[in-house]
């Protein structure tokens, strides 16, 4: 929108994101022609959108996310660090599907990154298991003053 002065629909934006977005720069990837409403002339218009255009738009937020994960990993104590080395990081949420994100996190943290099947729903599925077996999880979920 800012670069091309064109307003596109949600479906078009989602298609562009899925086909072009990456947490790393994509060299020589093909452009995608998108159509929308020209915000200046108020008429329909098409533009060629390149992966580099998407990367420039999302890289500041991706870098902030990767830096936050790396900072968290740097603050782990020895016990959690050994767990991290043994088990890696599980990347959940819809953003986990962003091409190259797991690779960037692996490089920054020196830890393996796993993406579960259907990462957008992974947290909800895990929470449903906790609720289903709440009594089994109660000892680790209850906060007591002597624990914190």
Model-derived segments and spans:
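Phosphate/ATP-binding catalytic cores across multiple sugar-kinase/actin-like superfamilies
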Residues: 57-85, 130-133
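Residue-level signature of catalytic and energy-coupling elements of molecular machines
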Residues: 69, 91, 127
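Phosphate-binding glycine-rich/basic clefts of nucleotide- and phosphate-handling proteins
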Residues: 1-59, 74, 84
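Glycine-rich phosphate-binding loops at beta-strand->alpha-helix junctions
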Residues: 21, 25, 81-105
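Conserved phosphate-binding/catalytic loops in two-lobed NTP-binding clefts
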Residues: 103-129, 137, 144
């Amino acid at each position: 929108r800012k670069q091309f002065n064109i307003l596109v629909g949600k479906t078009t934006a989602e298609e562009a994101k899925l086909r072009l977005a990456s947490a790393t720069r994509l060299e020589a990837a093909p452009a995608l022609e998108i159509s929308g409403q020209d915000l200046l002339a108020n008429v329909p218009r098409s533009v060629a959108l390149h992966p580099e255009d998407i990367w420039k738009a999302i890289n500041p937020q991706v870098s902030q996310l990767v830096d936050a994960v790396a900072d968290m990993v740097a603050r782990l104590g020895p016990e959690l660090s050994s767990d991290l080395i043994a088990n890696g990081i599980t990347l959940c949420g819809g953003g986990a599907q962003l091409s190259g994100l797991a690779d960037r996190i692996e490089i920054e943290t020196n830890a393996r990154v796993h993406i579960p099947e259907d990462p957008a729903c992974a947290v909800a599925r895990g929470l449903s298991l906790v609720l289903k077996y709440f009594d089994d999880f109660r000892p680790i979920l209850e906060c007591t003053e002597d624990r914190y």
